């Protein structure tokens, strides 16, 4: 994870209208977010008080704000199930000193406020790219819930945030020293769940296996680090609080141990045998596919990333096993969601659209299913599909408008024409992108 510097704001916005005025989007081409969605032309959508209030052929009153979309494509805002708000995905060719940076970031009230502002800037970067809801699954102390609360109270603009705050891990485990706190014992881990409940988190995040960079030898990515008794104790305590548990898992053994001991959401994943398939179904667990951070590590020139041959070898294992796991899950009726693991090198808050493309291309789903997965399906995973995720009367006005049809080419989403979040309209948002990041990633868009 990297803490990139920002040049002023990484976005610019024009606010067209506020939350309470009735606004009618005339003449749009509607993609409603449902599984079998197809483009519907010449549709009007009305929003008022942050909600969608009418869909169809609408006659405006004299007091209504009317925006003629002239056939542009209107769809639900994207939902990213896996982000890390303290980092922006800046290209790098050497490891960051994340432990030292984290100590500095949390060392004083002033530094914490600066990091909070940075997290907000990254959240806004995602919003300007059409991501209206994020699930933050590993941050610095309680900064993610603080940012969530400021946005929810109206003090700041921003996407809807469901926050886990810091992740729970084990000594020498994945991301310890930055977004993960190590638990020495089962009792320590349970106390951390209690602490997180006190911070009013929306879910708990566990780091159960190592990651690619943690592997010490070739062929050993995703080594199981957290023992079953700790996993079960954390899940039992979290479930007692009504909180779901997401877990970083990058090996078959890790998937099995996590799901069988109560984890609700497997982040990244790996290949699945019948035992894991049965466990997913028994426990109603879901898999969150995150191809975005794996592709650069597996496919880029090693010199571009500054990684060893062993790291790239392990990255390829993770990359292909994650794709195979997602395919197997879908074939067996297991729910698969989408996230980006934003914060990893070359994985930015503004590139959720690329994850949809990777999902279509590598997992073999249709473009409509990919868009459904990133909208209504992701909302179902979060338990907020009654609030957002599709264009339906009564739901929040979380909307993305593109100039062309994303079902023909997901690059249509790379620069939205308009974004609406809980009724607030942002027209022609501009995003400051990392040129090197876009240059390298575009090589693998086909």
Walk through the language-model features, giving the residues of each:
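Divalent metal-dependent hydrolysis catalytic cores, especially in the metallo-beta-lactamase
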Residues: 108-112, 119-144, 158-169, 201-215, ...
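Active-site microenvironment of metallo-dependent hydrolases
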Residues: 16-43, 48, 58, 105-106, ...
